[in-house]
Amino acid sequence: MEIVGSEAKRHFNLKEAEEFREKFFLRKRLFETSDMHFNIYCIAAGQENPLHRHPDSDEILYFVEGTGECVCGDETYDVKTGDLVFVPKDVPHAIRNTHESDNMVCILAQSPLPCVHVAVNRKPIS
């Protein structure tokens, strides 16, 4: 994963960090410290970040742009610009852009580190 910033960089323009791929969502690390990661997810129409969990890390998702669904444990939330979702450690979660043509942008923080990514083998959203 490309790291755009560092501990020294404290100001970002999210529009400049946005980049969309045709086949799979893009994740960029804007910065990291010894205690947390801060990423941007660029999710094109119809794409998703598949169901996974972080055994020892909490995650906060903020939806900057777009509409979609966010699975968090047994709940599925309709999300839109301005929504915030807290994902406690070890809770399976996924994000899906449900719009036919618009992009989705989500920023997120993960802490504490290391943040281990474990795939969960079930379809998150039907």
What are these regions (language model features)?
Residues M1-M36, N121-S126:
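A short, N-terminal "cap"/entry segment at the start of jelly-roll beta-barrel domains
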Residues K89-V116:
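Ligand-binding loop in jelly-roll beta-barrel domains
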Residues L26, L30-H37, G46-I60:
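A short beta-loop-beta micro-motif enriched in histidine and acidic residues
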Residues S34-M36, Y41, E75-Y77:
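Well-ordered beta-strand scaffold positions
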Residues D74-K89:
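Short acidic-glycine-tyrosine-enriched beta hairpin
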Residues C42-A44, R53-C70, A109:
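Short, conserved beta-strand element in jelly-roll/cupin
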Residues T67-E69, T76, P92, N103:
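Structural motif
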